[in-house]
């Protein structure tokens, strides 16, 4: 998908930031140019990201002698430093126009990609109103569509509000059962009804209404979980390496909560030559099984089908 991180972060900086962009980015430029010491975690993350090894440019950066860069070695990123310098000096145009954009377009053309110069030039971020519910006297707000995580979370809270959780031990099997059933219903709301609101009329108010939650809560049984026939066989699932989150509070009390992702760890694994930029793999978040009547997952959601200019549904909140 068209990279949106640079535009979004710079838009936030323009609206809310105090420091000059050059000052904000200089430490990052220095770090990319001078290098970082490869940690145990970074070494293992590279080794577990099969997609990195498939891309010639990524192999040059992240591998030595066909093995992940060694723990304790110095990893320098001169191309990435140049890209950050362009952004530092030219802002959004330093990424979405000029030599960086040309290299992205050239790489897309050489490898059968879909992003062209028009996609980059026309990209813009959007500020959207949060969505929220009242949960036991507390106002809870989160991100709305095209992010789907907020719908999941708020639906689950609404469902749980119909149960007196204080009656049960917090670590009891019944508590976990109710949490699981509430989240399942939240995922059901997300998977079938969420997409880019500029292209699809997402029934957000209805999805997170108390009336909808009451209906969803009615068929939760205290005695049993879902039928065994509807439960997939066990697959060992490790903690996801997909996404990064950070929260920052400054001396004036201003708070930033940022969840950021390339999709998978290291995204698509494809590095644009000469820029150090890793491309995301967010196209997988579209409904790539749209029209498949046997699918009940978000992969077939009518609200999230492929359309030009559309933003894919995000699972984050």
Residue ranges and their predicted role:
Residues 53, 123-124, 236-241, 312:
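Short loop/turn motifs at secondary-structure junctions and domain boundaries
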Residues 149-155, 185:
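Extended, domain-scale alpha-helical bundle/helix-rich regions
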Residues 12-18, 30, 34, 106, ...:
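Short, well-ordered loop/turn and helix-capping segments at boundaries between secondary-structure elements
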Residues 127, 240-243, 265, 316:
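Short, small/polar residue-rich loop motifs at catalytic or cofactor-binding pockets
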Residues 163-262, 275:
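Internal maturation/activation junctions in enzymes
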Residues 114-116, 254-317:
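Active-site rim segments in enzyme catalytic domains, especially the processed small/beta chain
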Residues 141-150, 243-247, 259-271:
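Glycine-rich phosphate/pyrophosphate-binding beta-alpha loops
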Residues 1-91, 95-144, 148, 208, ...:
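Noncatalytic scaffold domains of N-terminal-nucleophile
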